[in-house]
Amino acid sequence: MATATVPFFDSNDRLFDQGKAFWNNYLKGRPSAPDAFFQRLFNYHQSHGGQFGTVHDVGAGNGPYAHILRSKFQHVIISDIAKENVVLAEDRLGVDGFSYRAARVEEGDDIAPGSVDMVFATNVLHFCDQPLAMSEIARQLRPGGTFACAAFGAAQFEDPRIQDVYTRINHSGGRALLAKADDPEKLVAVMARTQGKYNVAPLDEGLFRPRAQRIHLNMENGGITAPLPPEVQVHEPVYTGVDDVETFVQEDGWSFVTGLEGVKEHVLSFPFARDDPNFGELWQEMEEIIGDDEVKGTWPAKIILATRR
């Protein structure tokens, strides 16, 4: 496989380089993936002949899922683009069965070819150069190894009034991000990949077995809410392959009940809200709708599972 230079994405790289306070709120404001999520990944991996030696948790942030991976694998490599996030992960998890590296998903020269049993990429692949990232992931995986990609995080609220304000908060935050982005075109592509069905991961048929699974959970109401403003035009390729198997499932374990404070924790788990000058006005609208009422909703999610040839 050819070696390529990984572009520096400037402000995009720094979106989740936010420090300990942000990550503490992130852990409260984002969904806790149910046991069924990880069981699906582990069952797929085992049924396709995968081993449970080394898993590489790429774009891991501060490693919120690394301890679950460690419960099945002998060794977990935790990588993130932000060095501070890696330090936070090591402070919490220690070194028994864990190793750490600060690097992009596209960078892996320090990892031996064919040495990884699973690459676990959750809530990160939309940031990447798609062909470069998938080429590097394939290089690391041993034959029969699993590429496990997932995205979840944006809520889908039952009350359409709450969902409307939430969507407008996302779009307003997206405009604020684009206004200060070093490369707005790249950031638009990132936002577009996140939206709806989570459009990532081109799977080279020479590197991955056919019939990869692209599983859409709880997307009956439109999929994942993203910060891409509706007035922005984007032309991103569709990365689902002709031999990929797409399924749409309503799955238990992804619903939530919370209140106004829980909604605020969730909104502030995204890095654009605090810096958006319109956030205060939009949040006041949210407060007026919710008041002291309970808020119900669901977490849409996307899972991609593929096996290395």
UniProtKB/Swiss-Prot annotation:
Pathway: Secondary metabolite biosynthesis. SUPFAM superfamilies: S-adenosyl-L-methionine-dependent methyltransferases. Keywords: Methyltransferase, S-adenosyl-L-methionine, Transferase. InterPro entries: Diverse_substrate_MTase (IPR051052), Methyltransf_11 (IPR013216), SAM-dependent_MTases_sf (IPR029063). Secalonic acids show unprecedented anticancer activities against various human cancer cells and might be interesting for further derivatization, targeting diseases such as cancer. GO terms for molecular function: S-adenosylmethionine-dependent methyltransferase activity. GO terms for biological process: methylation. It holds the Pfam family Methyltransf_11. Its EC number is 2.1.1.-. Residues 57-149 are annotated as: Methyltransferase domain. Methyltransferase; part of the gene cluster that mediates the biosynthesis of the tetrahydroxanthone dimer secalonic acid D. The pathway begins with the synthesis of atrochrysone thioester by the polyketide synthase AacuL. The atrochrysone carboxyl ACP thioesterase AacuM then breaks the thioester bond and releases the atrochrysone carboxylic acid from AacuL. Atrochrysone carboxylic acid is decarboxylated by the decarboxylase AacuI, and oxidized by the anthrone oxygenase AacuG to yield emodin. Emodin is then reduced to emodin hydroquinone by a yet unidentified oxidoreductase. Belongs to the methyltransferase superfamily. This is Methyltransferase AacuQ. The gene is AacuQ.
